[in-house]
Amino acid sequence: MNIVLEPGAAALLDALHRAGFGAYAVGGCVRDSLLGLAPHDWDLCTAARPGQVMELFGEDRCIPTGLQHGTVTVKRDGKLYEITTFRTEGRYSDGRHPDSVAFVPDLREDLARRDFTINAMAYSAEEGLCDPFGGREDLARGVVRAVGEPLRRFGEDALRILRLYRFAARFGFAIDEATEAAAKQLASHLDCVSAERIEEELNKLLAAPQPGAYLEPEVLAFVLPCLLYTSD
């Protein structure tokens, strides 16, 4: 299936390209487009540094939403677009957020830090689909699989464990065996995640067509301990 860029996103990407910066739509918008779904948001990534993005589009149109992580939100035609510089991430001492980030020129390095292969794809009209981890194949197979080493991905950010089941439930996908084994092994790390973020992910999971098939007891035991003692 061809990806049709939303007009505002296409215009921003074109401006970045004309200024000499590699730039792509990335993540969920690419995934949903390949599935034939309408993306809710269009996230963009680029080799341009945050200051260069703000200079290109003008400070009056830019919101410095996360400069330390390379993110600038750009206003265009009444919509907001997050543009993030390609980056790698350091250690996750708190099991939730990186201690540091480093801006890099290579898109593939940026994609390598992402959670699942189906979310680690990028697209531009000039270069087409960039899919170094087989996300498109996993979409076709109906599988959610971690990028790289699953234990590392979940060790970096325990909330990804719930995101694993949420994405599987949303799309009716199977879960890669090694990925699920790592999620169960590190489920206790969910203790480090705030109740608000856990509630948000659980609500999204429960909104899926058949959430019961993905409510994994070994994981929920660390999120909702009361379930261990529930009886009819």
What residues fall within each predicted segment?
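Catalytic cores of the polymerase beta-like nucleotidyltransferase superfamily
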Residues: 1-232
